[in-house]
């Protein structure tokens, strides 16, 4: 793919499709890392349900690693694209060098800081006495593979932002296919159970990591990994812009923890573990929605950033129209899929009739408001692509605040099952605020951007 010139001169509709679709597919495939693990874990004879609940408790760990990768990757990639749009490739190289260093440091510091506290953390995440051993086994091994996961996910942003969406997809596909192959081998053939699932995931992430590093050291991308030029100011700018997606994903952690804790509290000994298992299955389906949706809106950030940096705001406007359309079309399809294919999806995780019926009901509730969620993603990711974290962050925090309020309020009045309605409530009230702010602010931002080169001239 011709990265540099196409971002500034290719037909917008074709360009959006060429970058959005591979990015969406890559994110869909990346979901397989967690979903395939859960599918195979749920089929372990005699202990599938408890093992699945234990692995679900580890969801915040996976999310935590992803949030740190986004802190650097999503913080640095738009800045790199903007600098390329301005024609300043030296500054773009400096941004990538600083981001690579930060990813390396975080990949060592994160597991070192967390591992000593794994037992209280897992208890906080919602592990019961019955599920703790499964959660601890998966948690420990997955965390030891953090360097591979961080580098693979973080560096992939810098592959996609240079226009190489297909190559970014290859990195993800490599790891996902390897995970599908290795999971049954380690879980069943070697008899390692939950530990086998974690080992398969770590090895798969290692493969993706090696691919991403080799690509960014090779001759194909115009901006490659280099040494030197490290700057605290550059790192600060990256972390400032990346803080919005980081805090949002980190809050997803807290959301999972809060939901599991509330379900255990209101479900009690009789229903707590079953409700957590239902939540794990529903969260897996929501990943099938939100990860590809994020691929559409996040992958196309390079188009917005590059043209914004080149002062071509009309191309930015056109691109956003296509991105909004793609997001709405995707969420409409997934709303139908939740109702038509939901029972089949649930059966991948459990053969228990009662649990399957309850999990399907949970999925239907959680997907009631997917359409407005598509608008939320594009508004927030669009503001991030333009370097406007001051707008992106409050809008994201507002949606999370609505979610938290509903998680704690609903079950107090309507029982444990009502907690699942927190998702559609936040998916309506969040986008309403985001669209309102977008309509008010975006035209002013474009006008200010176009006046800047006139003043410089």
Each predicted region: which residue ranges?
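Transmembrane helical elements of multi-pass membrane transporters/channels
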Residues: 18-37, 141, 175, 204-208, ...
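Helix-terminus/linker motif at the lipid-water interface of multi-pass membrane proteins
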Residues: 28, 32-53, 122-129, 185-191, ...
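Short alpha-helical transmembrane segments in multi-pass integral membrane proteins
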Residues: 1-22, 80-147, 189-243, 304-369, ...
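Short runs within selected transmembrane alpha-helices of multi-pass transporters and secretion channels
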Residues: 142-160, 171-176, 197-212, 293-297, ...
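Small-residue-rich hydrophobic transmembrane alpha-helices
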Residues: 52-112, 149-168, 276-336, 340-342, ...
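N-terminal transmembrane alpha-helices
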Residues: 7-39, 43-47, 60-75, 79, ...
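Residue-level signal for transmembrane alpha-helical positions in Major Facilitator Superfamily
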Residues: 17, 32-33, 72, 113-117, ...
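Alpha-helical transmembrane segments of multipass membrane proteins
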Residues: 35-39, 112, 120, 154-158, ...
């Amino acid at each position: 793919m011709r990265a540099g010139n196409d971002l500034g001169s290719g037909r917008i509709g074709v360009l959006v499709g060429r970058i959005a679709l591979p990015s969406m597919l890559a994110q869909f495939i990346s979901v397989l890392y967690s979903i395939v693990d859960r599918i195979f874990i749920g089929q372990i004879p005699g202990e599938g349900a408890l093992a699945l609940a234990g692995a679900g408790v580890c969801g915040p760990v996976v999310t935590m690693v992803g949030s740190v990768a986004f802190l650097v990757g999503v913080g640095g990639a738009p800045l790199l694209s903007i600098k390329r749009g301005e024609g300043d490739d030296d500054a773009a190289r400096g941004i990538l060098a600083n981001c690579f260093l930060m990813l390396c440091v975080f990949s060592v510091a994160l597991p070192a800081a967390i591992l000593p506290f794994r037992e209280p953390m897992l208890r906080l995440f919602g592990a019961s006495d019955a599920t703790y051993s499964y959660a601890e086994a998966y948690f420990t091994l997955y965390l030891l593979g953090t360097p591979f996961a961080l580098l693979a996910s973080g560096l992939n942003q810098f592959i996609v932002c240079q226009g190489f969406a297909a190559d970014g997809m290859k990195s993800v596909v490599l790891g996902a296919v390897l995970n599908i192959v290795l999971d049954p081998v380690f879980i069943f053939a070697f008899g390692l159970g939950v530990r086998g699932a974690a080992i398969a995931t770590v090895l798969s992430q290692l493969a993706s990591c090696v691919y991403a590093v080799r690509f960014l050291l090779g001759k194909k991308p115009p901006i490659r990994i280099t040494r030197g030029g490290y700057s605290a100011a550059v790192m600060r700018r990256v972390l400032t812009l990346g803080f919005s997606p980081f805090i949002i994903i980190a809050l997803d952690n807290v959301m999972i923890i809060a939901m599991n804790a509330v379900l255990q509290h209101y479900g009690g000994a009789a229903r707590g573990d079953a409700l957590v298992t239902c939540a794990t299955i529903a969260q897996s389906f929501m990943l099938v929605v939100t990860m590809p949706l994020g691929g559409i809106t996040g992958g196309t950030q390079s188009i917005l950033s590059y043209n914004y940096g080149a002062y071509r705001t009309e191309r930015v406007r056109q691109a956003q129209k296509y991105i909004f359309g793609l997001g709405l079309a995707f969420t409409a399809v997934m709303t139908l899929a939740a109702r038509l294919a939901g029972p089949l999806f649930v059966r991948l995780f459990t053969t228990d009739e009662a649990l399957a019926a309850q999990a399907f009901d949970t999925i239907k509730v959680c997907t009631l408001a997917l359409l407005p969620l598509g608008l939320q993603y594009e508004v927030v990711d669009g503001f991030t692509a333009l370097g406007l974290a001051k707008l992106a962050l409050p809008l994201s925090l507002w949606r999370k605040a609505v979610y938290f309020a509903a998680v704690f309020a609903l079950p107090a009045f309507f029982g444990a099952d009502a907690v699942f309605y927190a998702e559609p409530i936040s998916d309506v009230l969040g986008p309403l605020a985001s669209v309102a702010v977008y309509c008010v602010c975006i035209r002013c931002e474009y006008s200010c951007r176009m006046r800047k080169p006139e003043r410089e001239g």
